[in-house]
UniProtKB/Swiss-Prot annotation:
Ranges where the Albumin domain occurs: 19-210, 211-402, 403-601
Protein name: Alpha-fetoprotein
Lineage: Eukaryota, Metazoa, Chordata, Craniata, Vertebrata
Cross-referenced Pfam families: Serum_albumin (PF00273)
Recorded name of the encoding gene: AFP
GO cellular component annotations of the record: cytoplasm; extracellular space
Subcellular localization(s) per the UniProt record: Secreted
Family per record: Belongs to the ALB/AFP/VDB family.
Length: 609
């Protein structure tokens, strides 16, 4: 699945150094150091993506004007000797264009950002990005007649408008990904406009690209949040893990080099440096293909594809198998050395080497699980250093680390057991009760959306073979929890959620699993308005009826977060009885008005609220 294999996109180092310093600081040659601008780069499209993502509410006309103005200025400043599309760094010029005329900053509330210096201005504008803002309606694919006419009249403008529409709704989407999706959209429009049934063609194919856009955008947003909140050390561990699993036959030095380069590329993408994001991506893909013999045989076929398909093929390639001949455990990786005698830098390098060795031996494990193993191993080594016989203690490390895998396996088994027993809807309700207790400050729609994702993940992962369920579940849970943490970052939920989100990336999921009830939450005074029942409960069907029932469940738990399972079952049984009684007769509204208050009185007495 995409979210599993595309976790390759999470990488290292919050660095703003030039490429030369990026290379020299680590003593490792970089594939990105030779800056050669691509004459084929479409700067109009890239600038459109930039302005649409940084000024999301700007109209297409306003964005087009900014694009025209800034490219006129930058083309003059670069001179005529350089090929079209060649500039060391247009990012500053793009940022200046947003602020240099008063109309845009004043109209869209950017004056505060624009009053700051260059770096602070950039960070301020980045912080204003909002994924799928409420003020912008969801993108709808235009009906075929209109689309095909516009496409035939001016294909370039049609696709540029598409880039504007998706970029403003998905401000964290990498520019390289946006261009890929636009090329995909181009093929869909071209094919469907020639189809006998254009409407059906548009509906089916547009649904596919919309799903891909949504998933990729969420993944890119997750990566940028990791870079923003956890910094170099955590990201280094994630990167080493991912690349060591992907290219398990590659040596440690090659992995280190690739980590640094990919890190720099992702940093630039997250900063909104649309031009460098694309160029770095192209150079990385070229480098990986030039090293296919060293890295992996699995990318050989990918490297024969055209550029656009090539990148997607490499990103979505499966992890290599564990190399033959590796020692079964890593107990003696330290040899006769005492971990606590290492300097801080030596400890970091050793842990990177341990993570590399462990990951290439466990290519099927989820990245978060290996991160917990590495974190636990470092704590174990530090503990051994305090013992009477450190070397003897260190030899028991492999056995000590099994508990992290076993904890995850037990949770996966328990979750899939519940899914098999309850099915999607009732499993979602179980998640709903649990997360309403953990985060009662979330609104009912937020809780329903969050737990629906969890239930969908269970439905997907639990269909896999048992050996794949853990990795699947951990990866999806990491992304879902990541979205919850982004929500907390924008508007704090409660201290417990904040602690889980910020204390340790590796331990996020176990932290949320162990979180039970928000002890700081004070239930609001009981309100009858939240528990008034009407005949629409009898008329609703499918998802609409399920949502009504779930809202009742949420309001109930919010009123009494300490509600026991037995109390909950009793109230649900009474509620089901009410529906059965009132929905069978003719006077449904009268029945609810008479029986509903009695149910609520009984419930309040039983719960003491």
């Amino acid at each position: 699945m995409k979210w599993v294999v595309s976790i390759l996109l999470i990488f290292l180092l919050n660095s703003t150094e030039s490429r030369t310093m990026h290379s020299n600081a680590y003593g490792i040659a970089s594939a990105l150091d030779s800056f050669q601008c691509s004459p084929e780069m479409n700067l109009v499209d890239l600038a459109t993506i930039f302005f649409a993502q940084f000024v999301q509410e700007a109209t297409y006309k306003e964005v087009s004007k900014m694009v025209k103005d800034v490219l006129t200025v930058t083309e003059k400043s670069t001179g005529s000797e350089q090929p079209t599309g060649c500039s060391e760094n247009r990012l500053s010029a793009f940022l200046e264009e947003i602020c240099h005329e008063e109309e845009i900053p004043e109209k869209y509330g950017l004056s505060g950002c624009c009053s700051q210096n260059e770096e602070e201005r950039h960070n301020c504008l980045l912080a204003r990005k909002k994924d799928s803002p409420a003020s912008i309606p969801p993108f709808q694919v235009p009906e075929p007649v209109t689309s095909c006419k516009a496409y035939e009249e001016n294909r370039e403008m049609f696709l540029n408008r598409y880039l504007y529409e998706i970029a403003r709704r998905h401000p964290f989407l990498y520019s390289s990904t946006a261009l890929y999706l636009a090329s995909h959209y181009d093929k869909i429009i071209s094919a469907c406009c020639k189809s006998e049934n254009a409407v059906e063609c548009f509906q089916s194919k547009a649904a596919t690209i919309t799903k891909e856009l949504r998933e990729t955008s969420l993944l890119n947003q997750h990566v940028c949040a990791v870079i923003r909140n956890f910094g170099p050390r955590t990201l280094q561990a994630i990167t080493v893990t991912t690349l060591s699993q992907r290219y398990s036959k590659a040596n440690f030095t090659e992995i280190q080099k690739l980590v640094l380069d990919v890190a720099h590329a992702h940093e630039e993408c997250c900063r909104g440096n649309v031009e460098e994001c694309v160029q770095d991506g192209e150079k990385l893909i070229s480098y990986v293909c030039s090293q296919e013999d060293i890295l992996s045989s699995s990318i050989v076929e990918c490297c024969k594809l055209p550029t656009v398909e090539l990148a997607q093929c490499i990103i979505h390639a499966e992890n290599d198998d564990k190399p033959e001949g590796l020692s079964p455990n890593l107990n003696r990786l330290l040899g006769e050395r005492d971990f606590n005698q290492f300097s801080s830098k030596e400890k970091d390098l050793f842990m990177a080497r341990f993570t590399y060795e462990y990951s290439r031996r466990h290519t099927k494990l989820a990245v978060p699980v290996i991160l917990r193993v590495a974190k636990g191993y470092q704590e174990f080594l530090e503990k051994c250093s305090q013992s009477e016989n450190p070397l003897e203690c260190q030899d028991k490390g492999e056995e000590e680390l099994q508990k992290y895998i076993q904890e995850g396996q037990a949770l996966a088994k328990r979750s899939c057991g519940l899914f098999q027993k309850l099915g999607d809807y009732y499993l979602q309700n179980a998640f709903l009760v649990a997360y309403t207790k953990k985060a009662p400050q979330l609104t009912p729609p937020e809780l329903i959306a969050l737990t629906r994702k969890m239930a969908t993940a269970a439905a997907t992962c639990c269909q896999l073979s048992e050996d794949k369920q853990l990795a699947c579940g951990e990866q999806v849970a990491g992304l879902i929890i990541g979205q919850l943490c982004i929500r907390h970052e924008e508007s704090p939920i409660n201290p417990g959620v904040g602690q889980c989100c910020t204390s340790s990336y590796a331990n996020r999921r176990p932290c949320f699993s162990s979180l039970v009830v928000d002890e700081t939450y004070v239930p609001p005074p009981f309100s009858d308005d939240k528990f008034i029942f009407h005949k629409d409960l009898c008329q609703a069907q499918g998802v609409a009826l399920q949502t009504m029932k779930q809202q009742f469940l949420i309001n109930l738990v919010k009123q009494k977060p300490q509600i026991t399972e037995e109390q909950l079952e009793a109230v649900i049984a009474d509620f089901s009885g009410l529906l059965e009684k009132c929905c069978q007769g003719q006077g449904q509204e009268v029945c609810f008005s008479e029986e509903g208050p009695q149910l609520i009185s009984k419930t309040r007495a039983a719960l003491g609220v």
